[in-house]
């Protein structure tokens, strides 16, 4: 017979981390928010698609706002207070995700645009004809 003390799942102790980095990847189709510590270890993440939005509703600012709120809930267990925000991509969820993180109670220390810009690298795709 197994002892009942061994049956209980051990909950991992979460380290208290004060400063974090929020990476917001805003594409035309979806928004991905990842919050990590200063070393780059992921603390939590959320996406607009994973928040219950499908199809064209994934690419709305409201979906990005809900995803940022969900990510903030996950990360607040670690005690994160200050965030550096790194925004990547041209999507519609850029600003609303930053505003949602600010409204969630984080002190935003800096906002940086890290969108990759080619110095005439790859040939762009052909123009859409609708």
UniProtKB/Swiss-Prot annotation:
It comes from Blochmanniella pennsylvanica (strain BPEN). Belongs to the universal ribosomal protein uS11 family. GO terms for molecular function: rRNA binding; structural constituent of ribosome. One of its GO terms (biological process) is translation. HAMAP family: Ribosomal_uS11. This is Small ribosomal subunit protein uS11. The keyword Kinase does not apply. InterPro entries: Ribosomal_uS11, Ribosomal_uS11_bac-type, Ribosomal_uS11_CS, Ribosomal_uS11_sf. Pfam families: Ribosomal_S11. Part of the 30S ribosomal subunit. Interacts with proteins S7 and S18. Binds to IF-3. Located on the platform of the 30S subunit, it bridges several disparate RNA helices of the 16S rRNA. Forms part of the Shine-Dalgarno cleft in the 70S ribosome. One of its GO terms (cellular component) is ribosome. Keywords: Ribonucleoprotein, Ribosomal protein, RNA-binding, rRNA-binding.
């Amino acid at each position: 017979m197994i002892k009942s003390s061994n049956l209980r799942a051990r909950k991992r102790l979460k380290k208290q981390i004060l400063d974090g980095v929020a990476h917001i990847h805003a594409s035309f189709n979806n928004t991905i928010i990842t919050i990590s510590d200063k070393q780059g270890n992921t603390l939590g993440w959320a996406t607009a698609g994973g928040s219950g939005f499908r199809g064209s509703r994934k690419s709305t600012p409201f979906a990005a706002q809900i995803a940022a709120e969900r990510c903030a809930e996950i990360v607040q267990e670690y005690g994160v207070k200050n965030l550096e925000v790194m925004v990547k991509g041209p999507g519609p969820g850029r600003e609303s995700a930053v505003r949602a993180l600010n409204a969630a109670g984080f002190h935003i220390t800096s906002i940086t645009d890290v969108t990759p810009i080619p110095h005439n690298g790859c040939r762009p795709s052909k123009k859409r004809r609708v």
